[in-house]
Curated annotation (Swiss-Prot):
Protein name: Ribosome maturation factor RimP
Organism, as annotated: Bartonella quintana (strain Toulouse)
Biological process, per Gene Ontology: ribosomal small subunit assembly; translation
Coiled coil (UniProt feature): none
Localisation per UniProt entry: Cytoplasm
Biological role stated in the UniProt entry: Required for maturation of 30S ribosomal subunits.
One GO CC term on file: cytosol
HAMAP family recorded: RimP
Family under the similarity heading: Belongs to the RimP family.
InterPro entries: Ribosome_maturation_RimP (IPR003728), RimP_C (IPR028998), RimP_C_sf (IPR036847), RimP_N (IPR028989), RimP_N_sf (IPR035956)
Keywords associated with the record: Cytoplasm, Ribosome biogenesis
Keyword Metal-binding applies: no
PANTHER family attached to this UniProt entry: RIBOSOME MATURATION FACTOR RIMP (PTHR33867:SF1)
Gene that encodes the chain: rimP
Chief location category: cytoplasm
């Protein structure tokens, strides 16, 4: 790997316990990578959000992380990159040439833990379920009535005949993420005044920094 692509938000929103389990996990190669990196992240006070293998613009292995105490600096992203990249090379997880991308969750973040849903209650999210509810598996709406068992999604764009309120248990969710809206951006920018992106060349210790807005 010649290039590591790092996307990082400064001062990310405060999260809860680093040991809080995720609601859903990866499969295949992504699950293997997750199993490798989680033990490396925890002693450094990081926790895994997700692992995703992307095919756009070549092969990219995205490892999305966050700190449990709510902070996530560019230096933190660099630390994670240095910590996991050597092990991934030694394990030869992906035989093809690929880019390693270390990323913080971003504004329209995935919702992978119960605390994520509690924290972002009142914002719009897209949710996909394992089992159909009212003949559907994909939903969009405002997160509401969050409990330890599940949530209510107040659909903001319900078609004629569709229910306005959908009760979704956590154990039926396979994917969920926030929808980028003006309100979400305003809320996030109050917590994250500086969104940063940067490339780190493994052959060059110098880091070039470029500030820009980041969308997953």
């Amino acid at each position: 790997m010649k290039l590591t692509w790092i996307k990082c938000m400064r001062k990310t929103e405060k999260m809860n316990d680093i040991d809080e389990p995720r609601l859903f996990e990866e499969t295949g190669i992504e699950a293997f990578v997750a199993a490798l990196v989680i033990p490396l992240l925890k002693p450094l006070d990081f926790r895994l959000v997700r692992v995703k293998l992307l095919g756009q613009n070549g092969l990219t292995l995205q490892i999305m992380v966050e700190r449990a105490d709510g902070s996530m600096t560019i230096e933190d992203c660099e630390t994670v990159s240095r910590t996991v990249s050597h092990l991934l090379d030694v394990q030869n997880v992906i035989e093809r040439k690929y880019h390693l991308e270390i990323s913080s969750p971003g504004i329209d973040r995935p919702l992978v833990r119960k605390s994520d849903f509690f924290h972002w209650q009142g914002h719009i999210a897209k949710i996909e379920t394992k089992i159909t509810i009212d003949g559907r598996k994909k939903f969009r709406g405002i997160l509401a009535n969050i409990t330890q068992e599940g949530l209510t999604l107040n659909t903001d764009k319900a078609a004629y005949g569709e229910a306005m309120y959908i009760a979704i248990p956590f154990d039926n969710i396979i994917d969920a993420h926030l929808v980028l809206t003006d309100e979400l951006i305003r809320n996030a920018l109050k917590k994250n005044k500086d969104l940063s992106q940067q490339f780190i060349s493994e052959d060059n210790p110098n880091v070039s920094k470029q500030l820009s807005n980041y969308k997953n």
